[in-house]
Structures are given as structure tokens and as C-alpha cells.
């Protein structure tokens, strides 16, 4: 749902506005989930070996939130994400069950970096 990626229209068509690009607290792991298309990231909070993950903060009108959440397929959902600044905000999280067949891509530090590496390797 990040800006300029395939599912971003699900935010913008509901009047969501981009607030800022930032990072999570260094308490998460990032995975490329099995299945698709589209390819989907899954971010999971961990007790150790976590890392800061690049993310975007968007503001959506409350009246549009329910229709947006209905579009989110399992194992993804909306939960509480801690930012690098310590704020706790609603954001995408992934259930542990979604990690079956997933690839740990935490080393890339974010979904865009992972996508860029895939594009570069396919050239």
C-alpha cells in the first residue's frame, strides 16, 4: 500500500493522505510472504534480533477505515506498530502463521529496497 506501489490506490481512493516516511523501532523482522501476485511484505514484532524497517505513515478518514480493513487478506492485519521515535501507531502487521513459506528479507531494511534488489537481479 506504499506510495507508487500496486495497492496504494486502496488508500488514495479512500481519501488517505501521505504524512511521512520513517522507520519502525528496531524490534521487527520483514518477510516476503508466499503467494501472490501481488508480492506482499509481512512485518512481525520480535523479542530479539529485530531491526528498524522503513515504513510510510498515512492518515485515513475514520469513515473509510472499515472498508479498507475489509480488503486486507490474512495473514496480514492492522495492529500496533512502534516507530523509531517511540510512537505507537496503527499499521500493517503479519500473523506468525503467515511466515510458512515466507522469505526473511529483514536485511534489506524495507520493502522498497527488497523490490529494487529483485528488479536489479532480473536485468
Where are these regions (language model features)?
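Glycine-aromatic micro-motifs
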Residues: 1-123
Amino acid at each position: 500500500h506504499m506510495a507508487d506501489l500496486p495497492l496504494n490506490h486502496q488508500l488514495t481512493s479512500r481519501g488517505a493522505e501521505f504524512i511521512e516516511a520513517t522507520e519502525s523501532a528496531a524490534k521487527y523482522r520483514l518477510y516476503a510472504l508466499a503467494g501472490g501476485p501481488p508480492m506482499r511484505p509481512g512485518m512481525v514484532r520480535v523479542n530479539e534480533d529485530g531491526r528498524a524497517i522503513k515504513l510510510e505513515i498515512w492518515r485515513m478518514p475514520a469513515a473509510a477505515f472499515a472498508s479498507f480493513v475489509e480488503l486486507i487478506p490474512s495473514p496480514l492485519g492492522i495492529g500496533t506498530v512502534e516507530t523509531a521515535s517511540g510512537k505507537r501507531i496503527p499499521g500493517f502487521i503479519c500473523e506468525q502463521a503467515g511466515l510458512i513459506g515466507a522469505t526473511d528479507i529483514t536485511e534489506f531494511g524495507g520493502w522498497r529496497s527488497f523490490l529494487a534488489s529483485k528488479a536489479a537481479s532480473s536485468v
